[in-house]
Amino acid sequence: MSLTYLNIMLAFSTSLLGLLMYRSHLMSSLLCLEGLVLSLFVLTTLMVLTINLTLTNLLPIILLVFAACEAALGLSLLVVVSNTYGVDYVQNLNLLKC
């Protein structure tokens, strides 16, 4: 395993550990999720470049589309929670249920 793959795996595990540890604020959870998606994007891009298979060329682009949708939904949820309650605690998400 090369040093590049090891660094990407370290970034993924650090983001996952941050997501598990800092669950109180929604903004920190969203930042950790973005770190996870960014490391997955770099890993899939490197894998596609090494495999050279034509069927997998669109995989990083599809992952970026899902990451953009995830970021947009997360930011809109952050705006709704902060406008409604004034804080961005994750425990306030239970209060948004109908």
From Swiss-Prot:
It is found in: Mitochondrion inner membrane. The keyword Transcription does not apply. It catalyses: a ubiquinone + NADH + 5 H(+)(in) = a ubiquinol + NAD(+) + 4 H(+)(out). GO terms for cellular component: mitochondrial inner membrane; respiratory chain complex I. It is a multi-pass membrane protein. GO terms for biological process: ATP synthesis coupled electron transport. Its main location: mitochondrion. Pfam families: Oxidored_q2. The chain crosses the membrane at residues 1-21, 31-51, 61-81. InterPro entries: NADH_UbQ_OxRdtase_chain4L/K, NUOK/Mnh_C1-like. Keywords: Electron transport, Membrane, Mitochondrion, Mitochondrion inner membrane, NAD, Respiratory chain, Translocase, Transmembrane, Transmembrane helix, Transport, Ubiquinone. Its EC number is 7.1.1.2. GO terms for molecular function: NADH dehydrogenase (ubiquinone) activity. Belongs to the complex I subunit 4L family. Core subunit of respiratory chain NADH dehydrogenase (Complex I) which is composed of 45 different subunits. Core subunit of the mitochondrial membrane respiratory chain NADH dehydrogenase (Complex I) which catalyzes electron transfer from NADH through the respiratory chain, using ubiquinone as an electron acceptor. Part of the enzyme membrane arm which is embedded in the lipid bilayer and involved in proton translocation. This is NADH-ubiquinone oxidoreductase chain 4L. It comes from Chalinolobus tuberculatus (New Zealand long-tailed bat). The gene is MT-ND4L.
